[in-house]
Amino acid sequence: MNENILVIEDEPDIRKNLEYNLGREGFKVSSVGSLHDAHQKINNNNFALILLDLMLPDGSGLDLCKKVKGNIKTEAIPIIILTAKDDEVDKLVGFELGADDYVTKPFSVKELILRIKAVI
């Protein structure tokens, strides 16, 4: 498969779980725990997909979603929001800002992998 996925998640256990399971599926995985680190990774790499948590220590993942989708160089990168926020309003805002899918925690790794494959 060999697609490069960026995981933006501040919980180390979730990040490691995603790295492991996505790696087993043949994806290359880069992961960061903050928006600051995410900006650097996005600017210096080509990603096939971004998995984005909304609640990060240095801001909202929604801001990053808006920036990625508003930049001509990165607007085509699919974004799947992966968050504990399950209110309908949060989902609608995520989709309005350009997210391609929205998955709430706790999540099924198998289902997430199928969603990733559908979006890529």
Regions found by a protein language model. Name each.
Residues M1-I120:
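N-terminal/domain-start alpha-helical segments
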